[in-house]
Design a protein with these regions (language model features):
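Short secondary-structure boundary/capping segments
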Residues: 118-129, 308-311
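RecA-like P-loop NTPase motor core
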Residues: 148-185, 197, 283, 300-303, ...
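Active-site donor-binding loop signature of nucleotide-sugar glycosyltransferases
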Residues: 110, 127, 133-136, 315
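Extended helical coiled-coil dimerization/tether regions that scaffold
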Residues: 1-54, 99, 112-119, 134-241, ...
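Eukaryote-specific, cytoplasm-facing alpha-helical/coiled-coil scaffolding segments in long proteins
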Residues: 202-206, 276, 361-366
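Switch/communication elements of ASCE P-loop NTPase nucleotide-binding domains
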Residues: 38-93, 221-354
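Short alpha-helical segments and helix-capping/turn motifs at coil-helix boundaries
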Residues: 10-14, 86-95, 385
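AAA+/P-loop NTPase substrate/partner-engagement loops
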Residues: 88-120
């Protein structure tokens, strides 16, 4: 025991007693099939996750760069490398420091134009794989049916939610995650904890009034709460629906040595909720000893992770280069991060001036975005989010 600090031992055993994982350091690298034109060598991305004494956390890595630089392509190749038949290293190669594979892989993307890997595509059946998104993988080749309808989202949420609240460990983790998300005032107003608690007495009276079997009573309980939860969920904004759907599935499916891969989670969220989500994700990854890799345009996300966990992608044409930012990013000013990542001074270009002027006049990201009538590129949206976030937090 003398090789471990009192704090580390106390925290580890407390976490294990609560159903969490033993936190260990681990590392892995992804070797791309693409070459660095300047050296002729394969491009590499290195990842190192620290278990204990991990402040700021190193369990979230970010791939960031200008629009069109290839972030989404890279994470898709990562997924194919891990999940598909890759004997010839067509999609690249993962090398893990522990010599094994990830236990779970969770792929999160809410793009309507996504082309996700399905469970049928998974070559190594020992790996648990879960896709969370807006494509119904049962009909991925049928353009009429492939997109999940918004009226299907409540049931998608409820099925995972029901599994979570029926598990003591998962339910506790869910409550912790919601508490972190509630640091965003708009999320706190949802009062998610009351959705079920206010109706429990009504359910108890219903069940006491019946003489049905335990199985039938369980079905009554599930259907009773399904109606309540679906009704509450249906009232939410699209951003709140997506964040809840994401978090409840992460709580449900993330286990030790899980790799979570996410594509542009900021697309549906306003900046304060982006920050809260990243903190909740990091807490969950720490509890389960997992790691997340996020492809993003968002300086707000970069602000939540240290420099060593940010891979900046640069290049043009066939040329690609991966490097860490020159500045420390955790908690850094968003203007400094934007300048570092996108390579120009905030306010030095024409569209920046317009974005800043609109941000100064509006009191929410949604209102600022509406000002542009759908005519903003992804990069500009990220910068507008950063301006609004700075405004709301000063």
């Amino acid at each position: 025991m003398r090789d471990f600090s009192y704090y580390a031992v106390k925290e580890q055993f407390h976490r294990i007693a609560d159903g969490g994982a033993v936190l260990t350091d681990y590392d892995f690298k992804y070797i791309l099939p693409d070459k660095d034109i300047t050296t002729g060598e394969n491009l590499e991305l290195d990842f190192y996750v620290e278990g204990e004494n991990n402040t700021p956390p190193s369990n979230i890595y970010v791939l960031i760069g200008k629009n069109g630089i290839g972030k989404t392509t890279i994470i898709k190749k990562m997924l194919k490398t891990l999940l598909c038949n890759n004997d010839l290293h067509t999609y690249g190669e993962f090398i893990t420091g522990w010599g094994g594979n990830f236990s779970n892989i969770v792929n999160i993307s809410f793009s309507m134009f996504d082309d996700p890997i399905t469970e049928v595509d998974v070559f190594d059946k020992m790996i648990f794989y879960k896709y969370i998104g807006l494509i119904d993988v049962r009909y991925e080749n049928d353009i009429r049916k492939r997109n999940v309808k918004y009226d299907q989202l409540p049931d998608m949420f409820f099925e995972s939610y029901w599994n979570v609240i029926k598990s003591i460990t998962k339910n506790e983790l869910w409550k912790r995650s919601v508490k972190i998300l509630e640091t965003d005032s708009t999320f706190k107003e949802l009062d998610i904890g009351s959705w079920i608690s206010q109706e429990k007495s009504k359910l108890e009276k219903m069940i006491l009034a019946t003489e049905k079997s335990i199985e039938e009573k369980n079905n009554i309980e599930k259907n009773f709460f399904r109606e309540i939860i679906n009704n509450q969920f249906s009232k939410l904004s699209s951003g709140h629906k997506i964040i809840l759907l994401t978090v409840v599935n992460l709580v449900n499916f993330v286990e030790e040595k899980t790799l979570v891969i996410m594509d542009e989670p900021e697309e549906h969220l306003h900046p304060p909720l982006v920050s809260a989500f990243i903190r909740a994700l990091s807490e969950l990854m720490s509890y389960r000893n997992g790691v997340a890799i996020i492809a993003t345009h968002s300086p707000v996300i970069v602000q939540e992770v240290p420099r060593r966990c940010v891979w900046k992608i640069r290049g043009h044409g066939k040329y690609r280069k991966f490097e860490h930012p020159e500045i420390e990013t955790f908690g850094e000013n968003l203007g400094e991060i934007t300048t570092e990542i996108f390579g120009y001074d905030v306010g030095s270009t024409g569209f920046h001036t317009i974005l800043k002027n609109v941000a100064d006049r509006k009191n929410s990201y949604e209102k600022a975005l509406n000002e542009f009538q759908g005519e903003l590129g992804k990069e500009a949206k990220s910068i507008l989010r950063a301006y609004m976030y700075d405004k709301e937090n000063t």
